[in-house]
UniProtKB/Swiss-Prot annotation:
One of its GO terms (molecular function) is ATP binding. The system is composed of three essential subunits: KdpA, KdpB and KdpC. The lineage of its organism: Bacteria, Pseudomonadati, Pseudomonadota, Gammaproteobacteria, Enterobacterales. Part of the high-affinity ATP-driven potassium transport (or Kdp) system, which catalyzes the hydrolysis of ATP coupled with the electrogenic transport of potassium into the cytoplasm. This subunit acts as a catalytic chaperone that increases the ATP-binding affinity of the ATP-hydrolyzing subunit KdpB by the formation of a transient KdpB/KdpC/ATP ternary complex. Disulfide bonds: none annotated. Pfam families: KdpC. One of its GO terms (cellular component) is plasma membrane. The chain crosses the membrane at residues 10-30. Belongs to the KdpC family. It is a single-pass membrane protein. Keywords: ATP-binding, Cell inner membrane, Cell membrane, Ion transport, Membrane, Nucleotide-binding, Potassium, Potassium transport, Transmembrane, Transmembrane helix, Transport. HAMAP family: KdpC. This is Potassium-transporting ATPase KdpC subunit. It is found in: Cell inner membrane.
Amino acid sequence: MSGLRPALSTFIFLLLITGGVYPLLTTALGQWWFPWQANGSLIREGDTVRGSALIGQNFTGNGYFHGRPSATAEMPYNPQASGGSNLAVSNPELDKLIAARVAALRAANPDASTSVPVELVTASASGLDNNITPQAAAWQIPRVAKARNLSVEQLTQLIAKYSQQPLVKYIGQPVVNIVELNLALDKLDE
């Protein structure tokens, strides 16, 4: 019985530290130092939340730039079902899926002159990716320009404006946040 008291005291102490003090402290510091990020990096227009800068959305229609395909369950870009397709590179189903995506993109983008960018036909590991390369966005310019009656130059400038450079110059590549880019497109129509 004498060994039970130190064990129980240690358990209660660690429970308070790891279950109470540490979570409250990290939450408070996160809210203090990084309030926008700690609250989900929400993109707001007035009082309305339009999305998150961290999670892609399923933009459909010719007037929007399309992001990477989502492999989440039930619906595209479902944040409660994050995950990839789990199809191996050697799986014939993956080949069929990619071929179908390429055919659909070719049909939707008949004026695109180069091959379909790889990130437009392959899902990310999370299935929630919100970024594509500026080249993948530029590949879609003819379709979006035609649907919105905008010039290629206007869309090229918009892509450049919303392109983000990697934190370290030689690690990573520039990306475009599709949610922010498409919301900016909608603002052009206002």
